[in-house]
UniProtKB/Swiss-Prot annotation:
Family, similarity comment: Belongs to the polyribonucleotide nucleotidyltransferase family.
Gene Ontology biological process terms, A to Z: mRNA catabolic process; RNA processing
Swiss-Prot/TrEMBL cofactor(s): Mg(2+)
Record: residues binding Mg(2+): 528, 534
Catalytic activity of the protein: RNA(n+1) + phosphate = RNA(n) + a ribonucleoside 5'-diphosphate
UniProt subcellular location: Cytoplasm
The protein, known as: Polyribonucleotide nucleotidyltransferase
Positions of the KH domain: 594-653
UniProt entry tagged with the keyword Cytoplasm: yes
GO molecular function annotations of the record: 3'-5'-RNA exonuclease activity; magnesium ion binding; polyribonucleotide nucleotidyltransferase activity; RNA binding
Keywords of this entry: Cytoplasm, Magnesium, Metal-binding, Nucleotidyltransferase, RNA-binding, Transferase
The enzyme's E.C. designation: 2.7.7.8
Length: 751
């Protein structure tokens, strides 16, 4: 029996010295009863099946396009059995949900306007290499199956992950589809999606439709410790341009396969269109009322007025015996179009927005900390009618989130949860488990803060941040970033820098025969709905930490995007001033927060600390009222409700594993075991090292400033040192002891 005809096309992604990646599209073999299906491979190891199905009839009562995107992570793809009780995949992982949103955002605006037939895209991850990140590959898979389906679809859409790699001598390079291990040397990471469009001069360009970006976990260390380039607004714009050739290659491969295999375009009914007579009737009836309504500053008052105007328009034009009876859909479409035109023309011509602000004006800001009793950290951030409460909770590292998904990341200690109750917009609705939007907003705020978190060694706590959206009128996600900075500082978390976020918008229209653009700072909910772009930017004073961009336009001029980025930076710096005026450094930890300290024991002593069947460690926990966890490298974390209990547990552990604990003032002839840009690590005794900071090395260099540690000390060299400090985690700070120095003389005097 002759098998099915299988056809394929591929895109070669050339990253220069970083190697090549090959994305292959295949159709005709699997899921042949779906409207469109495709297998997509990257380097032949990671593969996924995408299938697009189309409903036969329009959904009644829907005034939007019913598109559903689902991502199925199969554990067999990684050679694993699910960890659930029934050993079967259950609800989607957070990674899968975020990938659904990543696919939906560029695909949805590419469908024909007015469609009401239900469309479902299901992407199933069939196999995955351990070091692979599959989410942007899934965008291409979903686009391929949809392009083949015959749906009215202005695709194909290409998706690519770009990483800003830090190179020697401060250089950098953007690479496509980085592997997870490569991100350790990257300072910025972004997913970009777009499609090929025809320019006015007949050429081709790539219209960017979606961006999801963040600074990496290692960005701070790479920038501050190794001199890597910081991800500025200019570099982000450079990365977007660098992504375009890769997106075009992916779109070209899809178009090649679609040209040979696409089904005839489906003839589906369209809704929401309207004739010229309906447009004229709506404009004549509404008159100046539309402009007056959209000049009301208050959200609730404006919404009440718009509801009344909308109701009056329908009653007057579509009621029984009225000229447009039975044509309510047309009148609705004309009304929405007039609303959009009224708002846009006022912004572009008069430079005045809905609430009377100028294009770059920020609404009134308010920042307050310590707003709830007993919690570990809390804050309230308000921007106009948007109100966010942030609450921080600290616990031991063993409470960090364990991740059971196909992601190479298996745990995380910083968790951001975002809640959006219906009362935040003055409405009723379901409450309970989070919806996809809440998960997406929480993930965006989490990515914005992650690059400035202290290391596990500096702050050995699991951190849960919750953002409660108590009032919503524009960018609660960026409000959550601001509230998180405040609450984390209030909880005593030593952030490396404060982070603020701002939501930008863009409107465009033809004015006097010319297309004009206007970037809006701090957009309202209505400006988001009626505009062309939603652009969220978060960052510190020095660099960008997270970006999310969605646009409805077929390409944004580079100058317009650069201007919007600069405008966003100015707004971010202003908001940071407000945040730091409320709190500019970590507070003392709450008395209700657990105290977590650490001690290092030799790996060979771990068994002695635990004892037979856990007898020893259980006895210490019972005697001291503490909670103890031991890492494989010998790091012991001790959690307690108060400091004395934690110290008692540490003393008990030291008595077993470190019977001789160094104290301040003790001197050792140590051996240099490692040099860094900021100092040298000196081994005092087996398993006990200390840091000799570069600022302490003057005495070893004739009291002259030391610029390079290696000019004074080298690995293996012996050096006489004195312990000057033992911090609460048992870390030692050292100073050199030189014959004839002040410290040596003082010691001789005491003797």
């Amino acid at each position: 029996m002759e098998g099915p005809e299988i056809q394929s096309a591929e895109a070669v992604i050339d990253n220069g010295s970083y190697g090549k990646r090959v994305v292959r599209f295949e159709t005709g073999r699997l899921a042949r009863q779906a409207a469109g299906s495709a297998m997509v491979y990257i380097d032949e190891e990671t593969s996924m099946l995408s299938a697009t199905a189309v409903g036969k009839h329009p959904r009644e009562g829907f005034d939007f396009f019913p598109l559903t995107v689902d991502v199925e992570e199969r554990m067999y793809a990684a050679g694993r059995i699910p960890g659930s009780f029934f050993r079967r995949e259950g609800r989607p992982s957070t990674d899968a949900i975020l990938t659904c949103r990543l696919i939906d955002r560029p695909l949805r605006p590419a469908f024909g306007k007015g469609l009401r037939n239900e469309v479902q895209v299901v992407v199933t991850v069939m196999s995955i290499a351990p070091d692979e990140i599959y989410n942007t590959v899934a965008i291409n898979a979903a686009s391929m199956s949809t392009t083949l389906s015959g749906m009215p679809f202005q695709g194909p859409v290409g998706g690519v992950r770009m990483a800003l790699m830090a190179e020697e001598n401060g250089g950098h390079q953007w690479i496509a589809f980085p592997k997870h291990s490569q991100l350790e040397n990257a300072v910025f990471d972004m997913a970009v999606a777009g499609r090929v469009v025809t320019t006015k001069d007949g050429g081709q360009d790539v219209a960017i439709m979606m961006v999801e970006a963040e600074a990496t976990d290692n960005a701070w260390e790479l920038i501050k410790g190794q001199g890597a380039v910081a991800p500025s607004e200019e570099l982000v714009a450079e990365g977007l341009e660098a992504s375009k050739p890769f997106i075009k290659a992916l779109c070209d491969a899809q178009a090649d396969l679609a040209a040979r295999n696409r089904k005839p375009e489906l003839d589906l009914p369209r809704f929401g269109g309207f004739g010229d007579d309906a447009a004229q009737a709506v404009e004549q009836f509404v008159g100046e009322r539309m402009a007056q309504v959209y000049s009301i500053a208050g959200k609730q008052e404006r919404e009440a007025a718009t509801d009344e105007l909308h109701h009056d328009t329908l009653a007057e034009l579509t009621g029984e015996g009225k000229p447009f009876e039975g044509r309510a859909d047309e009148v609705n479409g004309a009304y929405q179009a007039l609303t959009k035109q009224t708002v846009r023309q006022r912004i572009l011509k008069d430079k005045v927005r809905i609430d009377g602000r100028g294009l770059t004006d920020i609404r009134q800001l308010s920042a307050e900390v310590d707003v709830l009793p007993r919690v570990h950290g809390s804050a309230l951030f308000e921007r106009g009618e948007t109100q966010i409460m942030g609450v921080t909770t600290l616990n031991m590292l063993k409470m960090e989130q364990q991740i059971d998904s196909l992601s190479p990341v298996k745990h995380k200690r910083y968790i951001h949860h975002y809640n959006f109750p219906p009362y935040s917009t003055g409405e009723t609705g379901r409450v309970g488990s989070p919806k996809r939007r809440e998960i997406g907003h929480g993930a965006l705020a989490e990515r914005a803060i992650t690059p400035v978190l202290p290391s596990r060694e500096e702050f050995p706590y699991a951190i849960r941040q919750v953002s409660e959206a108590l009032g919503s009128n524009g960018s609660t996600s960026m409000g959550s970033v601001c509230a998180s900075t405040l609450a984390l500082y209030n909880a005593g978390v030593p952030l490396r820098a404060p982070v603020a976020g701002i939501a930008m918008g863009l409107v465009s229209d033809t004015v006097d025969g010319e297309v004009q653009y206007a970037a809006l700072t701090d957009i309202l909910g209505a400006e988001d709905a009626l505009g062309d772009m939603d652009f969220k930017v978060a960052g510190t004073r020095e660099f960008v930490t997270a970006i999310q961009l969605d646009t409805k336009l077929d390409g944004i001029p580079a100058s317009v995007l650069a201007s919007a980025l600069t405008q966003a930076r100015e707004a971010r710096l202003y908001i940071l001033d407000v945040l730091t005026s409320a709190i500019d450094a970590p507070d003392e930890m709450s008395e209700f927060a657990p105290r977590v300290i650490s001690v290092t024991v030799p790996v060979s002593k771990i068994g002695e600390v635990i004892g037979p069947k856990g007898k020893m460690i259980n006895q210490i926990q019972e005697d001291t009222g503490t909670d103890i966890s031991i890492e494989d490298d010998g790091t012991v974390y001790i959690g307690a409700t108060d400091g004395p209990s934690a110290e008692a547990a540490r003393s008990a552990i030291n008595a077993i594993a470190n019977p001789q604990v160094p104290e301040v003032g003790e001197r050792y002839l140590g051996t240099v075991v490692k040099t860094t840009t900021f100092g040298a690590f000196v081994s005092l005794t087996p398993g006990k090292d200390g840091l000799l900071h570069i600022s302490e090395m003057r005495q070893l260099n004739d009291d002259k400033r030391v610029n390079e540690v290696d000019d004074v000390l080298s690995v293996g060299q012996k050096v006489q040192v004195e312990i000057t400090k033992v911090d609460d985690r048992g870390k030692l700070s050292l100073a050199p002891v030189v014959a004839g120095s002040d410290s040596d003389a003082a010691s001789d005097d005491e003797n």
